[in-house]
Amino acid sequence: MNNGDIRIEKIKLADLYDFACKTIANPTFKKAAPIPLIRALAQSKNPYGRPHDVVLLVAYCGDQCVGYQGLLPGLLKTEVQTSRVYWGMAWYVIPEFRRQGIGNRLLEEIKNTKIDYITPQMTASAESVFRRAGYKDLGRLTYFQLRVDRLNFSTGFFDVIITFLRKKATYPKIISSGLMRFNRLIYSITKRVLYRQAWQSSHRRQKPNLRWKVVDQIDESVGAPLNWQVKGPSFLRGVEVVNWMLKHPWLVPKSEKKTDVANFYFSVTREMFTYVAIAINSSDSRRTKGFLVLSVSKKKTKTRVKILDSYFNNPEDNEIAACLALRYAKIFLADRVDFPVSLEKYFKQMTGFKKLIKKQSHLFMFYPASSQSPLAVNIGKIAFNYCDGDTAFT
């Protein structure tokens, strides 16, 4: 096979959902479906997208889809202008066609499209491919993760026992299942005790003049300042994008999964997935304090709470985000909690948390439309956000 055998199709935003519908039960996409219906529908509603924006590159060899690269339109805000950027997502080549230049061909097609392109969160192997293709580091986002699953001390002990028992041909399987249930019980009790202590401590720190309620959408008048709370260059994430995310999630609980493509490499389901949008007011409900958006997901046996978007009229109220995140971590017995650098001190002051907190980072790589594009001239100046790109959706 040579590059002449590969054909790249560019799908525009206006055509994305119809294209996704055509991939269902289509033999061309038997081995690789470029986008599921739930994502196509959501992306077609992107408030920062335009009908003519190219949002998907599909690679074909003969009559078979062998790879794809998604593009998510976004905006870069600087002191002088707002300009368009495109976030990379869902870059994939089917196993039997890897190391044959298809991944590079997709990356070259992005260059030829002349867009300000950014890709966040990639594997080490993908990073090496991007570097060889000429993509450069844009910077790193730092955040923190509370890893309560480190307290699951008994797992290793019981694993040793179960492994030993399984070598015995006659051992009753009920023994291993009983040990696993006992391990889950111990860990569950440990989490309950830890979160109860943290919640009580956190709740005492909050002023009594506080009310909150879960809402379907964030009031635009409340969230309007979100666009400008970061000084200097940053990727715009206004309240319109937050509400789009809340209305059109990319993930659904497995129990709610409906007909969709069968061969999309990246998951569209979780054992559990939900957003929690919270409007926060003073005790008399006359004064708006701000809002908070969390996501709660369960993948296999691990439950994760993420602090996504928040805004407070008074920056000193920022700790409310941590307090409410702990409340939901307690409710769902989260194994991990992702939170921003601004809340590091708060979380480390909670009883038992300090040694469970781990610093994390995401690498952003880019390829500019030109050497003088808005993205290119702001390298080193951009403030990153945890929700940049498609992170909040996944």
Name each model-derived stretch:
Residues 4-6:
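Extreme N-terminal starter segment of soluble prokaryotic enzymes
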Residues 57, 67-69, 86, 91, ...:
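Conserved GNAT-family N-acetyltransferase fold
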Residues 52, 69, 89, 137-138:
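Contiguous, function-dense segments enriched for cysteine-driven chemistry
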